[in-house]
Amino acid sequence: MQYGLDKTDAALWQFINALKNAGIYDQTLIIVTSKHGQSPINKAKLVKPGHFADLVCTVSNFATTEGASIITNAGNNCPEGPCGWVQDDDIGLIWLPDQSKTKLVADYLNQNAPALFIDEVMSGEELKLKFRDPLTDSRTPDIIVQPVYGTIYTGSTKTKIAEHGGFSFGDTNVGLIVSNPALGQKVVKTPVLTSQVAATILKALGIDPSELESVRKEGITVLPFLFDQDGLEDE
C-alpha cells in the first residue's frame, strides 16, 4: 500500500508542478477520487472459498437439489440453447437459462447461505427496486448474491487479496480530495456522492449545473463547503 501511495503522490506532484510552470495552478480546481473501492480492507477478514458455482458443488445436498443443479449448469447450453451465466468475485451475479426458476434458485441460496458464505440474496421485487427488470433487460442478473464481508469467490490462492464490484462499505465508499489555493484546509465527514463532481466542475466554470439532465432528474447538488464566502468563486 505504501508503494501505491508514494507513486500516486509523485504523480500528483508532477501534475501540480506542470500547472505551476504553465502559470495556471491558481485557476485550476484539482479533484482526486476513485471510481470504486476494494474489499476487504481488513486482510484478516479475507476468505477465498473458490468460485461460486464450484462452491455450490460442495454443499451436501447438491446432487439432489434442482436449485443447485441450475446454478452449476447455467452456462452449459451456450450458445446452442437457453444460456445462463455465473459471474463472481466479491459478489455473485447469476443469469438463469430459465427465468421462471428464479424464486426456486433464490430459495435454495437462502437455505444454504452459511455454507455458501452468503450475507444477502437479492432477486424478484427487491432486485427491481434497485435495477432494471431482468425479464426485460438482459444486462440485469436474475439473482445477486452479496457474500459475507471479506469473501471473494475466486480460485486464486495467493495473488488476489481484494476485489471490487460488490456492495460492501469498502467497495462503495472512496475518499475524495478537492484542492485549490483559494480553499483552506478542511476535513469534511459528511457523506457525498461522486455524481456531485460533475455538477461541481460546471459551477466552478460558471456554468449552471442544472444544464445536466442528471442534475435535474436526480436532484444532484454541488460538493459542500467549496463555494462559501471564503471559498471558490464562480467564473
What are these regions (language model features)?
Residues 41-42, 49-50, 55-57, 153-155, ...:
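Short helix/loop capping segments that flank catalytic or ligand/cofactor-binding pockets
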Residues 188-191, 209-235:
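Cysteine endopeptidase catalytic domains of the caspase/legumain-like
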Residues 1-10, 50-78, 83-86:
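Acidic, His- and aromatic-enriched active-site or binding-groove loops in soluble protein domains
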Residues 2, 6-13, 22, 27, ...:
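Conserved structured core elements
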Residues 73-207:
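Active-site neighborhoods of enzymes that stabilize oxyanions during catalysis
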Residues 31-36, 126-128, 219-222:
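A glycine-rich phosphate-binding loop feature that marks nucleotide/adenosyl-phosphate handling sites
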Residues 9-51, 201:
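Metal-dependent active-site segment of extracytoplasmic phospho-/sulfohydrolases and closely related
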Residues 13, 17-24, 110-114, 202-210, ...:
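Sec-exported extracytoplasmic/periplasmic mature domains
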